């Protein structure tokens, strides 16, 4: 990611209060993991890392923002690290649970899958394109397309939960979102499975 991205997120985290309540998808499904080694991709200020640590996970919390990562230093069972996702190398077959919310970088899908142990759980939630969205990123490449999660993951994951739904924020703005909980099957996926 460019220096511009890092600066943008540093400013956002300095000047805007971050949500502190974990999304329901994570509180509902994280406990399905059979192990306790977790990865929080693009963790932001760490609401999900903190939740996972509170229920017994050891969490690698990754983000491009120094502000975000510094806020997580010293919290038991959270191991924050500032990374550039354009160049970061994920460990192979390392995590029992990987979560990612409101960050879409399709090139990471095969890397995330390789980092997940066989039988590991991937929990993902982000914005979905819809022409009537009132509060979503304006850059279409930052939005999933309808049916994209199922098309991308169905052939090598056991999809345990999949939904595309309208959500309303605190100001009443409506936005389409997509959510998935999937269990990595034996054999996993490689770059070729993602069209890379």
Give the positions of each predicted feature.
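Core SAM-dependent methyltransferase catalytic element
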Residues: 168-196
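A short acidic, Gly/Pro-enriched loop at the edge of an enzyme's catalytic core
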Residues: 90-97
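Conserved beta-strand signature within the Rossmann-like core of class I S-adenosyl-L-methionine
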Residues: 120-131
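Conserved SAM-binding motif I beta-strand of class I
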Residues: 58-63
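Conserved SAM/SAH-binding beta-strand->alpha-helix loop
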Residues: 65-67
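Conserved class I S-adenosyl-L-methionine
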Residues: 1-33, 35-44
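Conserved SAM-binding strand-loop segment of SAM-dependent methyltransferases
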Residues: 75-87
């Amino acid at each position: 990611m460019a220096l511009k991205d890092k600066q943008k997120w540093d400013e956002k985290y300095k000047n805007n209060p971050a949500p502190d309540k974990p999304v329901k998808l994570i509180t509902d499904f994280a406990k399905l993991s059979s192990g306790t080694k977790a990865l929080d991709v693009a963790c932001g200020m760490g609401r999900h890392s903190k939740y996972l640590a509170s229920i017994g996970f050891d969490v690698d919390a990754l983000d491009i923002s120094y502000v975000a990562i510094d806020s997580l230093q010293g919290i038991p069972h959270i191991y924050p690290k500032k990374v550039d996702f354009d160049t970061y190398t994920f460990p192979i077959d390392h995590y029992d649970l990987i979560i990612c919310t409101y960050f879409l970088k399709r090139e990471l899908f095969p890397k995330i899958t390789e980092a997940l142990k066989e039988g590991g759980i991937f929990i993902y939630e982000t914005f979905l394109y819809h022409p009537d969205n009132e509060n979503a990123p304006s850059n279409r490449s930052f939005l999933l397309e309808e049916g994209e999660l199922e098309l991308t993951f169905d052939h090598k994951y056991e999809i345990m939960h999949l939904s595309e739904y309208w959500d309303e924020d605190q100001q009443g703005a409506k936005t389409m979102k997509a959510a998935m909980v999937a269990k990595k099957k034996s054999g996993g996926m490689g770059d070729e499975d993602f069209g890379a």
